[in-house]
Amino acid sequence: VKTTISTFLNDLAKEWCATRPIVSFAYENRIEQDMPVAFDSALKQMICNVLDNALEASPQWVSLEATREADALTLVVTDTGPGFAPAMLAQIGKPYQSSKGRPGSGLGLFFVVNVARKLGGTVTARNREQGGALVQLTLPLAAISLEEETPHGD
């Protein structure tokens, strides 16, 4: 889908919030320089998976913050849930790693990590000092940009 970073994220945040039973969703789009991009359903699903995991751990409050730093889009999802167990943090991105104990669990973050890697991005997870979890997605703008590259002459 051809759009801009801000339009895509604003629409995604609005749709996600409207279709989930969340008490408080703090969304902050701090992208100062918007740009045309192409987002596909895998990118949307990737972001929604992280938000859904946060919601399951923290139904009262989830936060999504978007920033553009140099040549990367950074999305940070935080919650006030119990955080990650140390064993889970060591296994982030591996299939079937879940704290939910249900068949089929544990593919959400595996999917997230694989989509990010295919785009040359990264996913990091940690526990917040004040409690809860933080997951950061960093995607290179070159992987999603619609802007033409200008050839460099030698």
Model regions and ranges:
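Short beta-to-alpha transition helix within the HATPase_c
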Residues: 1-21, 47-48
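Conserved catalytic submotifs in the C-terminal HATPase_c
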Residues: 22-38
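Short alpha-helical Gxxx[C/S/T] motif in the catalytic ATP-binding
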Residues: 108, 112
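Acidic ATP/Mg2+-coordinating residue in the GHKL
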Residues: 79
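Short beta-strand/loop element within the Bergerat-fold HATPase_c
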Residues: 61-71
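Short conserved segment of the HATPase_c
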Residues: 84-96, 152-153
